[in-house]
A protein has these predicted regions:
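Conserved beta-strand signature within the Rossmann-like core of class I S-adenosyl-L-methionine
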Residues: 131-139
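Conserved SAM-binding strand-loop segment of SAM-dependent methyltransferases
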Residues: 81-93
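Conserved SAM-binding loop
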Residues: 74-75
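Conserved class I S-adenosyl-L-methionine
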Residues: 1-35, 37-46
Length: 191
C-alpha cells in the first residue's frame, strides 16, 4: 500500500470509520460454531473486534492491518477483553510479519480494496494451510471506476486458479445499498 493510502486510513481511525461497527458478523459466528478451533489470521483486522471474538472461542489468533492507528486501538481492546492475540502492522500484499499457516483466514473488507490482488493471493496461498478456509467479505463490481473497492469476475477467476474452491457465496447489500457478498473458500488439501 502506498504511503498516502496508509495515512488516509490512519486518519480515519482518529474517529470512527464507517466500516468499524464493533460487531462481529453472523457469518463469523456460524463458522466458529461449525469448525474446531485452530489458528486464525484476520487480514485487515482493524480495531480487533473479530480477533477478540475468535480468541474468546478458543482460536489462536493473529491479526494485522496496514493502519498503525487501528492496531494501537486493537491492542488496547484486546487487553481490556483479557484475551491473547498477536497483532502488528503489515501489508496484505507482503505479509512480512506473518509466519506459519492458518486453518482460517478472515478478510472483511480488505481484498476488495487491494490494488495488487495477485500479490495478496500469493501471500494467502503461503499462509493458508492445506484444507484451510478463507472467509471473505467484499463489495462486488458495480462501477467502471478502477479505483473503487470491488471484487470482479477477473478476481474470482484468479482465486479459483489459486487452488481455492468456492463453498458458498451469499450476495447482499451493505447499509448504503452497495452490492456485496460473503465468500467461503477452502484450499485444496494437496498442494
Amino acid at each position: 500500500m502506498n504511503l498516502f493510502r496508509r495515512l488516509q486510513f490512519d486518519l480515519w481511525y482518529l474517529g470512527s470509520p464507517p466500516w468499524d461497527s464493533g460487531i462481529t458478523p453472523p457469518e463469523v459466528f456460524e463458522f466458529i460454531q461449525s469448525h474446531p478451533a485452530g489458528r486464525a489470521l484476520d487480514i485487515g483486522c482493524g480495531t480487533g473486534t473479530n480477533v477478540i471474538t475468535l480468541a474468546k472461542a478458543g482460536w489462536q489468533v493473529t491479526g494485522f492491518d496496514f493502519a498503525s492507528r487501528a492496531i494501537q486501538i486493537a491492542k488496547r481492546k484486546i487487553k481490556r477483553a483479557n484475551v491473547q492475540a498477536e497483532l502488528f502492522t503489515d501489508d496484505a500484499t507482503r505479509m512480512k510479519n506473518v509466519s506459519g499457516q492458518f486453518e482460517l483466514t478472515l478478510d472483511i473488507g480488505c481484498f476488495h480494496g487491494v490494488p495488487n490482488k495477485v500479490d495478496y493471493l500469493t501471500q494467502l496461498d503461503r499462509v493458508l494451510a492445506p484444507g484451510g478456509f478463507w472467509l471473505m467479505y467484499g463489495f462486488l463490481a458495480q462501477t467502471s471506476d478502477p479505483t473503487a473497492p470491488r471484487i470482479d469476475s477477473a478476481d474470482l477467476s484468479r482465486i479459483s486458479a489459486q487452488g481455492l474452491t468456492l463453498l458458498s457465496q451469499r450476495n447482499g447489500f451493505d447499509k448504503r445499498e452497495r452490492p456485496s457478498a460473503w465468500f467461503f473458500y477452502q484450499k485444496s488439501k494437496k498442494k
